[in-house]
Every structure is written in structure tokens, then in C-alpha cells.
């Protein structure tokens, strides 16, 4: 009897196609990856596909990452999904804003593959 191993699902949210492509390349070996290009799409996908973790860019058109994170964390159907803010803005104030909106972690661009994988594994290992 074959054992089926189910990969955890990661939602990558970034308005830059190159960042999504790089993140997908880094993550696709260990995770199922879905993508969104703005906060509104992220909320829809979080509700319909229930990812195990969300990597959310902070600054995007249509709806920024902080607003989307807050909406995801307010919704009973998605509030337990960890959100990791991934952004070029590493100021302490922005980190605190992300935490206030419900973000679980933070990764600053540019990041190494190990930075991203380590943060996801850390967040997924936290009960």
C-alpha cells in the first residue's frame, strides 16, 4: 500500500510577478504553492483554498498586505491561518503594524531561500 504524503499549502501574495516566481521556485519542492497578486485575491483564496500559511507582501495596489492580513485574521473561517509579512520595508514600526494586524512573522526582502524556508517551518511548527 502506497503512502500518500500531502504537502502543506502556501499562498504567496505579491504584486511583483518576479517575486512570486522566485518564491514559487524556492517553495515548490516542499510545498503546494498558490499565488495572488493583491490583498483582495489573497482574501478570496484564503477562504476558498484554506492554505496552511500565507506569505503576504506589505505594499500592493488594490489592497495592501496589512489590510488583507487584518481581514483574514478577523474572519472566523481564516483567522487561524498564519500570515508572514514579506516586504522590503524592515522598519520596526512596520513590523509592529504587521503584528497588530495579526501577522505571525516577518521576512525582509531580499531574502535567501533558507530565510524563507526557515520562517515557514518555524511558523508551521508553532501550535
Positions of predicted regions on the chain:
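Receiver (REC) domain active-site loop signature in two-component systems and cognate sites
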Residues: 60
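C-terminal output helix
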Residues: 111-121
Amino acid at each position: 500500500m502506497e503512502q500518500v504524503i500531502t504537502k502543506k499549502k502556501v499562498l504567496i501574495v505579491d504584486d511583483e510577478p518576479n517575486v512570486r516566481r522566485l518564491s514559487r521556485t524556492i517553495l515548490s519542492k516542499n510545498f503546494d504553492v498558490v499565488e495572488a497578486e493583491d490583498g483582495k485575491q489573497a482574501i478570496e483564496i484564503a477562504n476558498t483554498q484554506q492554505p496552511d500559511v500565507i506569505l503576504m507582501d506589505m505594499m500592493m495596489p488594490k489592497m495592501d498586505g496589512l489590510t488583507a492580513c487584518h481581514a483574514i485574521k478577523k474572519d472566523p473561517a481564516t483567522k487561524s491561518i498564519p500570515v508572514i509579512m514579506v516586504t522590503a520595508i524592515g522598519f520596526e514600526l512596520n513590523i509592529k503594524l504587521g503584528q497588530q494586524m495579526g501577522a505571525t512573522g516577518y521576512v525582509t526582502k531580499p531574502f535567501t531561500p533558507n530565510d524563507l524556508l526557515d520562517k515557514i517551518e518555524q511558523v508551521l511548527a508553532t501550535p
